[in-house]
Amino acid sequence: IAPLVSTADIAVCHLEAPIAPPGQEAMVEPQRISSAASITNALAFAGFDRCSTASNHSVDRGAAGVDATVAAFEAAGMGQSGVARTEAERLPALMTVNGVKVAHLAYSYGFDGTPLPAGEPWRANIIDPASIIADARAERALGAEVVVVSLHWGASMASNPTADQQRVAEAVTASGDVNLI
């Protein structure tokens, strides 16, 4: 896919699984998954610029998995949105694409019952229209001209949006601060 992906002005992917912490193996268990750090190098090689990392599996490996995920993207020279090592890192850096400053934000519907690390609600972004709008406004205050939001949501095996998805999308786009979901 590299010839196709690398021609895009900006190429964004989604990584469903967090990266396994150093010294731990990638895993696939019922309800808990993680990937090897080498996947970020493969995504960079394919031409992706950044990935959304907010998913129902974002905190499957706890804070160590979040830290490993951010570090793996940094090592691959890629950006990511959706998880953070620190509260200050929660809002991603702006990208400049053909002279336009672009923000990419990412959120998940939840974490399948896995709690966020105690006292660290900023570790992974959860879908909340007011928070999304506030984050988009913060990115605009930093100079973003375009704000793109990736939402990890939906009902399994459903081809139509739920009423809640429609409500969230309408609220977020009506704000005027988000250009694209």
Identify the residue ranges that each predicted region occupies:
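Acidic, metal/ion-coordinating pockets
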Residues: 1-181
